[in-house]
Amino acid sequence: MKRFFSNLFKRKQDQNSHIKQINGPTTSTPTTTPTTPTTPTTTQTPTPQNNNTNNNTNNNNNTNSNNSNQQKKEQAQASPSTNQTQTPSNNTISTSPTVTTQPSFTPGVISTSKLTTSPPESPRPPTSTTNTTQPSTTTTTATNSTNTNTASAPTKTASPSSPSATASPNNNSNNTTTTAATTTTTTTTTTTTNANQTASVNHTSSDQSLNAQNVTQTNNNNNNNNNNNNNNNANNTKPINPNDYIPLDFVDSTPKVDNNQPKRKASGPPEILPEEIDRTDFLGQGSFGSVYKGKCRGQEVAVKIPRKQKLSLYELTSFRHEVKIMSKIFHPNVVLFLGACTQSGKMQIVTELCQTDLEKLLHNDRTKKEFSLFRRMQMAKDAALGMNWLHGITRIVHNDLKTANLLVDINLRVKVTDFGFSQIKEGEEFQDKAAKGTPLWMAPEVMMGNPYNEKADVYSFGIILWEILTKEAPYSHHKDYDIFFNAICNEKERPPIPADTLPSLRHLIQTCWDHNPQNRPSFSEILFRLNEILIDCAIDFDDGRKYWKEHFLVPKQELQEEVEWSDFEKTLKATHKQLNLDYAPLKELLVQQSHQTVQKTKQVVTMERFDKVSKWFGSFFEPNTGIETIDNINKLSAKIWFHGDIVREQATSRLSKAAEGAFLIRLSSTEPKTCPFTLSMKNNQHRRIQLIDENNFTGFKIQGKTAVYNSLIELVEKCNDYPLLVPCPKFTQETFNPYDPYTN
């Protein structure tokens, strides 16, 4: 390299002496050439002040310049061994080192020789929109000595990372000739100009010089915008109109990223940088690690910090593979995986944020009373749906399925979390001994270190079902791990199931935690069993359960927890086989608006409402007794004093507007099976009406009174216990729709 630069400087001196022999001594214009190891060389001279006054002189000199070029061509043919570019100049010569040796060429003549070898590859692809060049061997800037104005504008030789181009301001673009040619080692560009023009000789690769033909760009006074001289483009700046809309300044909140880090791919697992995650509140801690509430890219998220941060190369590769799998799982009952930071020592998992988890709901003294068994079984079904998706799509074994890993969102939908990522999970300690996972929910084969499959998650789900049923923690009496291990793995101990448990639910729990994994059902079968259990939980009567299972539970299909009224009415008509039966009053009692669809006007019959109406009036869906029951509903609905399903506060409000001695009869939701109706009177008096069903006799009486009546209508008409004088009228715009009982 040292010898290369010494030879280069020697050739430069020979070139300068040769120029002096041709043109004689000249006066060089002062030039400032800032040079740094990493920035391009810039040659600057004073900008001409009265450029337009020299246009005529420049045009006259153009002919002489062209003749001079022709003479030089003839001289070059006589001496082809000349190895330097000769250009008359009184200006500064700016040079930069070349990478290759120069073959012989004719001075002043564009080289047309073919490439003998392929040019060197550019380290970066050429960019046509930037004024940058590859490292050029020689850049010569000159002005005609015969011109009276020898000052020229600054000439820039751009950075060595882009295609070659020399920017030179000139208003006389029609007098400019710019050419570029390529050879195996050197490309020479000779430009002949007048007093305000420059001659540039640049070396470019073959691909770059094809795109560099006829390129001469001008620099405006601010040296910011460049226009093409050959197209005569002027520098036009649109004036700012004060009436124009000016947007607010954009404040870039993007974290500053180190450019030395490897670039992230546009596709693949979502890699998140540590500086993009902002942790705020601490949410909890488990076998996975610590969980925080935080923000990532403007979104509220849950941030999980694994305990295990130092991974081997194999573990880190496996972890990144699991991240890729997690990013492809989308299901409403699986917590949405948003991304992960996989840098060793800074590993973090980012997921959607949920409000709470099932463990807190079941064991909190306030919240555990708010959920019926039917609602809790719906939560169990949500968890089974998520696990069935994981087992069926990705073949993922959770290994740590428990109520704490079943998150609950604001809509009380349960979502499975903390699945996968086995490389960064550590065993939760139970007297310092455990495999990966939590021992209380762990299958025996996992605790014993035997091979296991997805049926280990089924065992854990059996413990979860027991916990959902009883709202108690499993194995609370065990404190020692060795005793616990022996009880579960050898003695096959399981939590006690309450005696009043539904037979269908008892059977499912027992099969799920069976000691033999082969006897445990799959989650697909569990879902079907849970559909049956949901019907058993929602409907108390055996004939009602049978009716719903026969008509609205299709094998291998989803359970219809809500049935549109039109479909429900068809099944009733098919059962009763009587065309002139009026179902309108029954519809007012049964129909609710759907909670499962966005379409609020959709009228449906739910399993819970079906059960409640059956308790109030009897089996209206039976082929024989159902017709009589519907007839009784129609007669009762025609009475002015029957107000249907309204609450106590609403009954008091209506009676306050009525005359003295006013009363009404409403449906009771507290004990609909034993006391289906309530007598409400003025002055905030409410008495339950008890159903008498014994010895093949059905009748009614006011609770606390002795008189028994054959029907509710007879009770109202013949009651002597209370002065039922004035029936409280119903409002004309009011219906019995229980979904909106406050309509007045």
UniProtKB/Swiss-Prot annotation:
Chain ranges of the SH2 domain: 641-734
GO molecular function ontology, one term from the record: protein serine/threonine kinase activity
Keywords: ATP-binding, Kinase, Membrane, Nucleotide-binding, Serine/threonine-protein kinase, Transferase, Tyrosine-protein kinase
Signal peptide: none
SUPFAM superfamilies per the UniProt record, alphabetical: Protein kinase-like (PK-like), SH2 domain
Pfam families in the cross-refs: PK_Tyr_Ser-Thr, SH2
Region (Disordered): 1-276
SMART domains, per the entry: S_TKc (SM00220), SH2 (SM00252)
Residues engaged in binding ATP: 283-291, 304
Domain Protein kinase intervals: 277-534
Active site: 400 (proton acceptor)
Localization terms from the record: Membrane
Family recorded in the similarity comment: Belongs to the protein kinase superfamily. Ser/Thr protein kinase family. SH2 domain-containing protein kinase subfamily.
Function noted in UniProt: Required for proper chemotaxis and phagocytosis; proper spatiotemporal control of F-actin levels in chemotaxing cells. Negative regulator of the PI3K (phosphatidylinositol 3 kinase) pathway. Predominantly phosphorylates serines and threonines and tyrosines at a lower level.
Name assigned to this protein: Dual specificity protein kinase shkD
Species this chain originates from: Dictyostelium discoideum (Social amoeba)
Gene behind this protein: shkD
